[in-house]
Amino acid sequence: MRHGKAGRKLNRNSSARVALARAQATALLREGRIQTTLTKAKELRPYVEKLITTAKGGDLHARRLIARDIHDKDVVRKVMNEVAPRYAERQGGYTRILRVGTRRGDGVTMALIELV
């Protein structure tokens, strides 16, 4: 039984899931929106929201916690200086997931995840 086992495996091992989450979070925070599968978007949402909430702390410790997951210095700078202040008054709910149809090759549901 898998009681209490949150999260999805996404048909990957642990390190590949971490790499996927970091890469997609970096792309989302850099571009503001990305298109991916619905399942990956649902896994990405809490990861990015926790990063933004951490960045709202605004101090050096918060910057280092963000840099631990986002390995692009420009994106870390953008999160700390632009994204976090934008959501200073907002208590969560920084992202939106929109379904955009199915992928032609395998019929999987695609989604657009964007910063609100």
Swiss-Prot record:
One Pfam family of this chain: Ribosomal_L17
SUPFAM superfamilies this protein is in? Prokaryotic ribosomal protein L17
One GO MF term: structural constituent of ribosome
Report the source organism.
Deinococcus geothermalis (strain DSM 11300 / CIP 105573 / AG-3a)
Q: List the keywords (alphabetical).
A: Ribonucleoprotein, Ribosomal protein
Task: Kindly list the residue ranges recorded as spanning the membrane.
Answer: none
Signal peptide as annotated in the record: none
Task: Say which family it is in.
Answer: Belongs to the bacterial ribosomal protein bL17 family.
Q: Which PANTHER family does the entry mention? A: LARGE RIBOSOMAL SUBUNIT PROTEIN BL17M, RIBOSOMAL PROTEIN L17
- The cysteines joined by S-S bonds are none
Q: Which GO terms describe its cellular component?
A: cytosolic large ribosomal subunit
Q: Which InterPro entries match?
A: Ribosomal_bL17, Ribosomal_bL17_CS, Ribosomal_bL17_sf
| Keyword Membrane on entry | no
Query: Subunit structure of this entry?
Result: Part of the 50S ribosomal subunit. Contacts protein L32.
Among the GO biological process terms of this entry, one is:
translation
State the name under which the record lists this protein. Large ribosomal subunit protein bL17
